[in-house]
Amino acid sequence: MSKAKITAIGTYAPSRRLTNADLEKIVDTSDEWIVQRTGMRERRIADEHQFTSDLCIEAVKNLKSRYKGTLDDVDMILVATTTSDYAFPSTACRVQEYFGWESTGALDINATCAGLTYGLHLANGLITSGLHQKILVIAGETLSKVTDYTDRTTCVLFGDAAGALLVERDEETPGFLASVQGTSGNGGDILYRAGLRNEINGVQLVGSGKMVQNGREVYKWAARTVPGEFERLLHKAGLSSDDLDWFVPHSANLRMIESICEKTPFPIEKTLTSVEHYGNTSSVSIVLALDLAVKAGKLKKDQIVLLFGFGGGLTYTGLLIKWGM
Protein backbone atom coordinates (compact mmCIF):
# COMPACT_ATOMS: atom_id res chain seq x y z
CA MET A 1 0.00 0.00 0.00
CA SER A 2 1.21 3.50 -0.82
CA LYS A 3 1.95 5.93 1.98
CA ALA A 4 1.32 9.68 2.15
CA LYS A 5 3.01 12.62 3.80
CA ILE A 6 2.90 16.42 3.90
CA THR A 7 5.71 17.86 1.77
CA ALA A 8 4.99 21.60 1.46
CA ILE A 9 3.16 24.44 3.17
CA GLY A 10 2.06 27.96 2.25
CA THR A 11 -0.08 30.64 3.88
CA TYR A 12 -1.54 34.04 3.15
CA ALA A 13 -3.26 36.71 5.23
CA PRO A 14 -4.64 40.06 4.04
CA SER A 15 -2.58 43.10 4.96
CA ARG A 16 -5.35 44.94 6.82
CA ARG A 17 -5.24 44.45 10.58
CA LEU A 18 -8.26 44.80 12.85
CA THR A 19 -6.90 45.35 16.35
CA ASN A 20 -8.67 45.26 19.68
CA ALA A 21 -8.32 49.05 19.78
CA ASP A 22 -10.19 49.23 16.45
CA LEU A 23 -12.97 47.07 17.85
CA GLU A 24 -13.31 49.39 20.86
CA LYS A 25 -14.54 52.02 18.38
CA ILE A 26 -17.15 49.68 16.86
CA VAL A 27 -18.76 47.91 19.83
CA ASP A 28 -18.82 48.15 23.62
CA THR A 29 -15.63 46.21 24.39
CA SER A 30 -12.03 46.72 25.47
CA ASP A 31 -8.61 45.30 24.76
CA GLU A 32 -8.45 43.95 28.30
CA TRP A 33 -11.84 42.21 27.96
CA ILE A 34 -10.94 40.59 24.63
CA VAL A 35 -7.47 39.41 25.67
CA GLN A 36 -8.70 38.08 29.00
CA ARG A 37 -11.47 36.01 27.41
CA THR A 38 -9.93 34.98 24.07
CA GLY A 39 -6.19 35.69 23.97
CA MET A 40 -6.69 37.64 20.73
CA ARG A 41 -4.96 40.94 19.97
CA GLU A 42 -5.64 41.39 16.25
CA ARG A 43 -7.06 39.67 13.20
CA ARG A 44 -6.68 40.14 9.43
CA ILE A 45 -9.52 41.40 7.24
CA ALA A 46 -9.95 40.93 3.49
CA ASP A 47 -10.59 43.93 1.25
CA GLU A 48 -14.10 44.56 -0.08
CA HIS A 49 -13.26 42.99 -3.44
CA GLN A 50 -11.09 40.18 -2.05
CA PHE A 51 -12.81 36.82 -1.63
CA THR A 52 -11.95 33.34 -0.39
CA SER A 53 -10.66 32.04 -3.72
CA ASP A 54 -8.30 35.03 -3.94
CA LEU A 55 -6.81 34.20 -0.55
CA CYS A 56 -6.52 30.51 -1.45
CA ILE A 57 -4.69 31.34 -4.68
CA GLU A 58 -2.21 33.51 -2.77
CA ALA A 59 -1.60 30.71 -0.25
CA VAL A 60 -0.86 28.27 -3.09
CA LYS A 61 1.50 30.81 -4.67
CA ASN A 62 3.33 31.01 -1.34
CA LEU A 63 3.54 27.21 -1.14
CA LYS A 64 4.75 27.04 -4.74
CA SER A 65 7.56 29.53 -4.04
CA ARG A 66 8.81 27.36 -1.17
CA TYR A 67 8.38 23.93 -2.78
CA LYS A 68 11.30 22.40 -4.66
CA GLY A 69 9.19 20.31 -7.03
CA THR A 70 6.42 21.04 -9.53
CA LEU A 71 2.69 21.40 -8.92
CA ASP A 72 1.81 20.63 -12.54
CA ASP A 73 1.06 17.01 -11.58
CA VAL A 74 -1.38 17.85 -8.78
CA ASP A 75 -4.31 15.47 -9.38
CA MET A 76 -6.80 16.68 -6.74
CA ILE A 77 -7.62 20.00 -5.09
CA LEU A 78 -9.55 19.96 -1.81
CA VAL A 79 -10.63 23.31 -0.40
CA ALA A 80 -12.01 23.57 3.13
CA THR A 81 -14.19 26.65 3.49
CA THR A 82 -17.47 27.91 4.90
CA THR A 83 -17.26 31.18 2.94
CA SER A 84 -17.06 30.10 -0.68
CA ASP A 85 -17.23 32.90 -3.27
CA TYR A 86 -20.42 31.34 -4.66
CA ALA A 87 -23.00 28.75 -3.62
CA PHE A 88 -21.53 27.07 -6.70
CA PRO A 89 -19.16 26.70 -8.53
CA SER A 90 -16.79 25.59 -5.81
CA THR A 91 -13.81 27.56 -4.58
CA ALA A 92 -11.63 24.60 -5.58
CA CYS A 93 -12.72 25.08 -9.19
CA ARG A 94 -11.71 28.75 -9.03
CA VAL A 95 -8.26 27.74 -7.78
CA GLN A 96 -7.96 25.19 -10.61
CA GLU A 97 -8.97 27.77 -13.18
CA TYR A 98 -6.29 30.19 -12.01
CA PHE A 99 -3.44 27.67 -12.16
CA GLY A 100 -4.74 25.83 -15.22
CA TRP A 101 -4.25 22.27 -14.00
CA GLU A 102 -6.75 20.51 -16.26
CA SER A 103 -6.15 16.88 -15.21
CA THR A 104 -7.15 17.42 -11.61
CA GLY A 105 -10.27 16.91 -9.55
CA ALA A 106 -11.56 19.83 -7.50
CA LEU A 107 -14.09 19.99 -4.68
CA ASP A 108 -14.94 21.93 -1.54
CA ILE A 109 -15.32 20.56 1.98
CA ASN A 110 -17.75 22.24 4.36
CA ALA A 111 -16.83 21.04 7.83
CA THR A 112 -16.34 24.52 9.33
CA CYS A 113 -13.36 24.63 11.69
CA ALA A 114 -12.65 20.92 11.17
CA GLY A 115 -12.37 21.37 7.41
CA LEU A 116 -8.58 21.25 7.14
CA THR A 117 -8.22 18.08 9.20
CA TYR A 118 -11.05 16.43 7.24
CA GLY A 119 -9.27 17.45 4.03
CA LEU A 120 -5.98 15.94 5.19
CA HIS A 121 -7.78 12.77 6.28
CA LEU A 122 -9.39 12.44 2.84
CA ALA A 123 -6.12 13.20 1.04
CA ASN A 124 -4.37 10.47 3.00
CA GLY A 125 -7.10 7.98 2.07
CA LEU A 126 -7.09 8.91 -1.62
CA ILE A 127 -3.32 8.52 -1.83
CA THR A 128 -2.90 5.35 0.24
CA SER A 129 -5.69 3.71 -1.79
CA GLY A 130 -3.67 4.34 -4.94
CA LEU A 131 -6.29 6.59 -6.53
CA HIS A 132 -4.22 9.79 -6.36
CA GLN A 133 -0.57 10.79 -6.00
CA LYS A 134 -0.37 14.52 -5.23
CA ILE A 135 -3.15 16.49 -3.53
CA LEU A 136 -3.41 20.13 -2.54
CA VAL A 137 -5.36 20.58 0.68
CA ILE A 138 -6.32 24.24 1.03
CA ALA A 139 -8.22 26.08 3.75
CA GLY A 140 -9.58 29.55 3.08
CA GLU A 141 -11.99 31.83 4.90
CA THR A 142 -13.30 35.39 4.60
CA LEU A 143 -15.27 35.26 7.83
CA SER A 144 -15.38 39.05 8.07
CA LYS A 145 -17.97 39.01 5.28
CA VAL A 146 -20.38 36.92 7.37
CA THR A 147 -19.63 38.45 10.79
CA ASP A 148 -22.19 40.62 12.57
CA TYR A 149 -20.21 43.67 13.70
CA THR A 150 -23.03 44.76 16.00
CA ASP A 151 -22.63 41.61 18.13
CA ARG A 152 -19.69 42.13 20.46
CA THR A 153 -19.60 38.48 21.52
CA THR A 154 -18.75 37.27 18.00
CA CYS A 155 -17.25 40.19 16.05
CA VAL A 156 -14.14 40.21 18.26
CA LEU A 157 -13.35 36.62 17.29
CA PHE A 158 -13.07 36.14 13.56
CA GLY A 159 -10.46 36.88 10.90
CA ASP A 160 -9.60 36.09 7.28
CA ALA A 161 -6.72 33.99 5.90
CA ALA A 162 -5.81 30.98 3.78
CA GLY A 163 -3.32 28.15 3.97
CA ALA A 164 -2.27 25.24 1.78
CA LEU A 165 -0.60 21.89 2.42
CA LEU A 166 0.70 19.52 -0.24
CA VAL A 167 0.18 15.81 0.42
CA GLU A 168 2.18 13.38 -1.72
CA ARG A 169 2.64 9.65 -2.15
CA ASP A 170 5.74 8.28 -0.44
CA GLU A 171 6.73 4.63 -0.70
CA GLU A 172 8.93 4.64 2.39
CA THR A 173 7.75 6.87 5.23
CA PRO A 174 4.11 7.10 6.40
CA GLY A 175 3.25 10.65 7.34
CA PHE A 176 -0.21 9.83 8.71
CA LEU A 177 -0.23 7.62 11.80
CA ALA A 178 -3.84 7.56 13.05
CA SER A 179 -7.12 9.47 12.94
CA VAL A 180 -10.39 9.90 14.83
CA GLN A 181 -13.65 11.48 13.75
CA GLY A 182 -16.95 12.22 15.41
CA THR A 183 -20.12 14.22 14.98
CA SER A 184 -22.85 15.59 17.25
CA GLY A 185 -25.47 16.75 14.78
CA ASN A 186 -27.86 17.52 17.63
CA GLY A 187 -25.69 20.58 18.31
CA GLY A 188 -26.16 22.06 14.86
CA ASP A 189 -28.17 24.98 16.19
CA ILE A 190 -25.41 26.36 18.46
CA LEU A 191 -23.14 27.41 15.57
CA TYR A 192 -24.56 28.08 12.11
CA ARG A 193 -25.12 30.39 9.19
CA ALA A 194 -28.64 30.03 7.81
CA GLY A 195 -29.30 29.01 4.21
CA LEU A 196 -32.40 27.81 2.37
CA ARG A 197 -33.91 26.17 5.44
CA ASN A 198 -34.94 28.32 8.42
CA GLU A 199 -34.91 25.77 11.25
CA ILE A 200 -32.65 23.07 12.63
CA ASN A 201 -33.40 20.56 15.39
CA GLY A 202 -36.70 22.38 15.89
CA VAL A 203 -34.94 25.69 16.51
CA GLN A 204 -35.89 28.72 14.40
CA LEU A 205 -32.76 30.14 12.76
CA VAL A 206 -31.73 33.76 12.35
CA GLY A 207 -31.73 34.24 8.58
CA SER A 208 -29.45 37.27 8.42
CA GLY A 209 -26.73 35.63 6.37
CA LYS A 210 -24.35 36.19 9.29
CA MET A 211 -22.79 33.63 11.60
CA VAL A 212 -24.68 32.87 14.79
CA GLN A 213 -22.87 31.24 17.70
CA ASN A 214 -23.72 30.20 21.22
CA GLY A 215 -20.15 30.56 22.39
CA ARG A 216 -20.74 29.15 25.85
CA GLU A 217 -22.20 25.90 24.50
CA VAL A 218 -19.49 25.51 21.84
CA TYR A 219 -16.86 26.02 24.55
CA LYS A 220 -18.46 23.38 26.79
CA TRP A 221 -18.74 20.87 23.94
CA ALA A 222 -15.10 21.29 22.87
CA ALA A 223 -13.74 21.16 26.42
CA ARG A 224 -15.79 18.01 27.04
CA THR A 225 -15.01 16.25 23.75
CA VAL A 226 -11.44 17.00 22.70
CA PRO A 227 -9.47 15.66 25.72
CA GLY A 228 -10.98 12.17 25.48
CA GLU A 229 -10.44 12.01 21.72
CA PHE A 230 -6.87 13.24 22.23
CA GLU A 231 -6.23 10.15 24.35
CA ARG A 232 -8.11 7.83 21.96
CA LEU A 233 -6.04 9.05 19.03
CA LEU A 234 -2.76 8.39 20.83
CA HIS A 235 -4.02 4.94 21.85
CA LYS A 236 -4.92 4.06 18.24
CA ALA A 237 -1.35 4.85 17.19
CA GLY A 238 0.16 2.96 20.11
CA LEU A 239 1.73 6.15 21.44
CA SER A 240 1.65 8.15 24.65
CA SER A 241 1.76 11.89 25.23
CA ASP A 242 5.51 11.51 25.88
CA ASP A 243 5.94 10.57 22.20
CA LEU A 244 4.20 13.73 21.05
CA ASP A 245 6.21 16.79 20.04
CA TRP A 246 3.38 19.26 19.34
CA PHE A 247 -0.38 19.60 19.80
CA VAL A 248 -2.12 21.84 17.23
CA PRO A 249 -5.82 22.31 18.03
CA HIS A 250 -8.13 24.61 16.11
CA SER A 251 -7.32 28.13 17.34
CA ALA A 252 -10.85 29.05 18.34
CA ASN A 253 -10.02 30.79 21.59
CA LEU A 254 -6.88 30.64 23.71
CA ARG A 255 -8.86 30.17 26.92
CA MET A 256 -10.66 27.19 25.37
CA ILE A 257 -7.32 25.67 24.35
CA GLU A 258 -5.98 26.16 27.88
CA SER A 259 -9.07 24.42 29.26
CA ILE A 260 -8.57 21.49 26.88
CA CYS A 261 -4.88 21.16 27.79
CA GLU A 262 -5.69 21.17 31.50
CA LYS A 263 -7.67 17.96 30.90
CA THR A 264 -4.85 16.21 29.02
CA PRO A 265 -1.34 15.22 30.14
CA PHE A 266 0.14 17.51 27.49
CA PRO A 267 1.58 20.92 28.47
CA ILE A 268 0.23 24.15 26.99
CA GLU A 269 3.85 25.15 26.30
CA LYS A 270 4.01 22.53 23.52
CA THR A 271 0.78 23.63 21.91
CA LEU A 272 0.91 25.60 18.64
CA THR A 273 -1.71 28.30 18.00
CA SER A 274 -2.39 31.22 15.66
CA VAL A 275 -5.09 32.93 17.69
CA GLU A 276 -3.16 35.91 19.08
CA HIS A 277 -2.47 37.70 15.79
CA TYR A 278 -5.02 36.11 13.43
CA GLY A 279 -8.06 35.50 15.62
CA ASN A 280 -10.34 32.56 14.87
CA THR A 281 -9.86 31.77 11.18
CA SER A 282 -11.98 28.61 11.26
CA SER A 283 -10.56 25.94 8.91
CA VAL A 284 -7.35 27.96 8.38
CA SER A 285 -6.20 28.24 11.99
CA ILE A 286 -4.27 24.96 12.15
CA VAL A 287 -2.23 25.54 8.99
CA LEU A 288 -1.44 29.09 10.16
CA ALA A 289 -0.17 27.68 13.47
CA LEU A 290 1.94 25.09 11.64
CA ASP A 291 3.49 27.70 9.37
CA LEU A 292 4.24 30.05 12.26
CA ALA A 293 6.09 27.15 13.93
CA VAL A 294 7.97 26.31 10.72
CA LYS A 295 9.12 29.92 10.32
CA ALA A 296 10.15 30.09 13.98
CA GLY A 297 12.23 26.93 13.64
CA LYS A 298 10.08 25.05 16.16
CA LEU A 299 8.52 22.45 13.87
CA LYS A 300 11.09 20.04 12.44
CA LYS A 301 11.11 17.05 10.11
CA ASP A 302 9.90 13.74 11.60
CA GLN A 303 8.40 15.33 14.71
CA ILE A 304 5.11 13.79 15.87
CA VAL A 305 2.23 16.26 15.76
CA LEU A 306 -1.40 15.90 16.84
CA LEU A 307 -3.81 18.05 14.82
CA PHE A 308 -7.37 18.49 16.07
CA GLY A 309 -10.06 20.41 14.20
CA PHE A 310 -13.51 20.90 15.72
CA GLY A 311 -16.45 23.16 14.98
CA GLY A 312 -19.93 23.71 13.60
CA GLY A 313 -21.94 20.64 12.80
CA LEU A 314 -20.95 19.82 15.43
CA THR A 315 -18.06 17.74 14.05
CA TYR A 316 -14.38 17.02 14.59
CA THR A 317 -11.37 15.20 13.18
CA GLY A 318 -8.10 14.50 14.92
CA LEU A 319 -4.94 13.37 13.13
CA LEU A 320 -1.58 12.11 14.29
CA ILE A 321 1.07 12.94 11.72
CA LYS A 322 4.81 12.75 11.28
CA TRP A 323 5.90 16.13 9.93
CA GLY A 324 7.36 15.53 6.48
CA MET A 325 9.40 18.65 5.81
Swiss-Prot record:
Please give the function described in this protein's UniProt entry.
Catalyzes the condensation reaction of fatty acid synthesis by the addition to an acyl acceptor of two carbons from malonyl-ACP. Catalyzes the first condensation reaction which initiates fatty acid synthesis and may therefore play a role in governing the total rate of fatty acid production. Possesses both acetoacetyl-ACP synthase and acetyl transacylase activities. Has some substrate specificity for branched chain acyl-CoA, determining the biosynthesis of branched-chain of fatty acids instead of straight-chain.
Reactions catalysed: 3-methylbutanoyl-CoA + malonyl-[ACP] + H(+) = 5-methyl-3-oxohexanoyl-[ACP] + CO2 + CoA; 2-methylpropanoyl-CoA + malonyl-[ACP] + H(+) = 4-methyl-3-oxopentanoyl-[ACP] + CO2 + CoA; (2S)-2-methylbutanoyl-CoA + malonyl-[ACP] + H(+) = (4S)-4-methyl-3-oxohexanoyl-[ACP] + CO2 + CoA; malonyl-[ACP] + acetyl-CoA + H(+) = 3-oxobutanoyl-[ACP] + CO2 + CoA
The record's listing under Pfam families reads: ACP_syn_III, ACP_syn_III_C
Q: Give me the ranges of the annotated region ACP-binding.
A: 251-255
Q: Would you tell me the protein name for this molecule? A: Beta-ketoacyl-[acyl-carrier-protein] synthase III 2
Q: What is known of its domains?
A: The last Arg residue of the ACP-binding site is essential for the weak association between ACP/AcpP and FabH.
**UniProt keyword list:** Acyltransferase, Cytoplasm, Fatty acid biosynthesis, Fatty acid metabolism, Lipid biosynthesis, Lipid metabolism, Multifunctional enzyme, Transferase
Q: Please state where this protein is localized.
A: Cytoplasm
- Give yes or no: UniProt keyword Cytoplasm: yes
This chain's source organism reads Bacillus subtilis (strain 168)
Record note on quaternary structure: Homodimer.
What GO molecular function annotation could you give as one example from this UniProt entry?
Answer: 3-oxoacyl-[acyl-carrier-protein] synthase activity
By which gene is this protein encoded?
fabHB
Gene Ontology, cellular component aspect: cytoplasm
Its Gene Ontology biological processes?
fatty acid biosynthetic process; secondary metabolite biosynthetic process
Its organism's taxonomic lineage begins at:
Bacteria, Bacillati, Bacillota, Bacilli, Bacillales
Q: In which pathway does it act?
A: Lipid metabolism; fatty acid biosynthesis
Question: Belongs to which family?
Answer: Belongs to the thiolase-like superfamily. FabH family.
Q: Is the keyword Transcription in the record?
A: no
Q: Which residues form the active site?
A: 113, 250, 280
What is the induction note for this entry?
Answer: Down-regulated by FapR.
Highest rank taxon of the organism: Bacteria
EC number annotated for this UniProt entry: 2.3.1.180, 2.3.1.300
Which of the seven top EC classes does this enzyme belong to? transferase
